[in-house]
Design a protein with these regions (language model features):
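A generic structural signal for short, non-catalytic loop/turn and secondary-structure boundary residues
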Residues: 1-3, 34, 53-54, 82-84, ...
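Well-ordered alpha/beta subsegment
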Residues: 108-113, 119-146
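Ordered hydrophobic segments in well-structured contexts
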Residues: 4-9, 58-60, 69-71, 88-90, ...
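Short, extreme N-terminal leader segments that mark the start of a protein/domain
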Residues: 1-23
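Positively charged, polar, low-complexity stretches
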Residues: 8, 18, 35, 39, ...
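Short, well-structured hydrophobic secondary-structure segments
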Residues: 26-69
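Short, solvent-exposed amphipathic alpha-helical segments in soluble enzyme
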Residues: 23-24, 76
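Aromatic- and Lys/Arg-enriched surface recognition patch
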Residues: 71-118
Length: 146
C-alpha cells in the first residue's frame, strides 16, 4: 500500500490555479529543452522514500480543503548554494482533483496514509461537484449540503 505526502498549496486559490501553475512551469521547461516534470522543493527529505515511490502522491491542501494530488515519481535530496540540505519532490505534471475534504493548516509536509486519502473525482456525480465554481462548492459544503 503506497504512502503519500500532504502539503499546503500556499498562495493557491483553486485547483484550476494549481493546474495553471503546473502548465506554466511545463511551458517554461519545454522552451528551455528541460524534462517535463513538476518539481517542488522542500527543506526536509522524507525518510520513507521507498514507500512514497511505490505509487504515492503529493496531496495539495487548497484554502482549507484537500483538493488535488500529483503522483510522486522521484525524490532527490541536494544541497543548495549555501550548503543547506533540501529535497526535490518530482511529480508527474498532471494535477488530479480529489473529493474535497476539510483540512486545517499545518507547516511543512506530513505523511498521509492510503486509507486517509480522499478518492479521485471521476466521471460520476462527484465530477459535477468538481465542475462547480469553488466558492459555490465551499458554500454548499459549509451548509452541509455536500
Amino acid at each position: 500500500m503506497p504512502l503519500h505526502l500532504i502539503k499546503l498549496a500556499v498562495g493557491c486559490e483553486s485547483v484550476r490555479e494549481l493546474k495553471g501553475w503546473v502548465a506554466e512551469r511545463m511551458a517554461t521547461a519545454r522552451k528551455k529543452g528541460l524534462p517535463l516534470r513538476h518539481i517542488h522543493i522542500t527543506r526536509m527529505t522524507p525518510k520513507r522514500d521507498q514507500e512514497l515511490l511505490a505509487g504515492g502522491s503529493l496531496y495539495w491542501v487548497i484554502r482549507g480543503e484537500i483538493a488535488a494530488r500529483e503522483k510522486i515519481i522521484a525524490i532527490e535530496p541536494f544541497r543548495d548554494k549555501d550548503g543547506i540540505g533540501r529535497c526535490r519532490l518530482v511529480m508527474q505534471p498532471k494535477v488530479i482533483a480529489v473529493s474535497p475534504r476539510p483540512m486545517r493548516a499545518f507547516q511543512g509536509w506530513r505523511y498521509f496514509t492510503e486509507d486517509a486519502a480522499p478518492p479521485d473525482l471521476g466521471k460520476s456525480a462527484a465530477a459535477s461537484v468538481a465542475a462547480m465554481p469553488e466558492p459555490m462548492r465551499r458554500e454548499l459544503r459549509d451548509l452541509g449540503l455536500l
